[in-house]
Amino acid sequence: MTRRSSGYWRVTINHPPLNIFGPYLIPQLNEAITAIETDDQVKVVVFDSAIPGFFLTHYDFLAKVEDPTSLPPGPTGLQPLLDILVRLSRAPVVSIASIRGRATGVGSELALACDMRFASREKAILSHFEVGAGIVPGGGPMARLPRLMGRGRGLKVLLGADDISGALAERYGYVNRALPDGQLDEFVDALATRIASFDKRAISETKRFVDVASLPPDYELAPE
């Protein structure tokens, strides 16, 4: 995590060679989210990747099964990954995913938990492949995707289990905007810098009202 300024932070995912999500990343993400929640100056945080071709991919199936399941629930009472995603969505800070490369499974779920998503038109690939592998997504995309793109398109993404390009993600509403790859970093940095120049209370209160009207409740993210 780097601080561009007191109000503008970046969380850069750097787990070579493929940025595969696994139990070892949960404490690191939790530490980042806790810092974002508790710092009284940060206003905007950008999530990006240091690994070419990969934003964040799903999942390290070679990790011991007991590793993630042995972790206690987080402050929300939800399982650790879902707890982190819910807290990110509700944090009094603007979160932006800058997607270049593959954002699959958990990578997509992290992007969906952010307030805004911007993608490389040429290099971003978003996907929920889980149904094709015989598993059910666990990070709440069934509640988030239909709110962004409608029920039919949400089901297409989840049940089609196929890659979605940056350009198609923009058409679907999966991301706010897909930009030419050479413009992505400059655009996101300019937006984050602009937001960070505004009053923190105005930012957090505006976001809170939008959250009340738009975020899924916990029981939709983790149905029994």
Indicate where each model-derived feature is located.
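Hydrophobic/aromatic residues within transmembrane alpha-helices
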Residues: 47, 60, 110-112, 169, ...
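Structural motif
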Residues: 91, 98-99
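CoA-thioester-processing core
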Residues: 84, 98, 104-158, 187, ...
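Glycine- (often His-adjacent) and acidic-residue-rich active-site loop
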Residues: 49-87, 103, 134
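C-terminal long alpha-helix characteristic of the crotonase
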Residues: 119-124, 175-223
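Conserved CoA-thioester-binding segment of acyl-CoA-metabolizing enzymes
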Residues: 1-48, 52, 86
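Well-ordered beta-strand positions
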Residues: 110, 116, 156, 160-162, ...
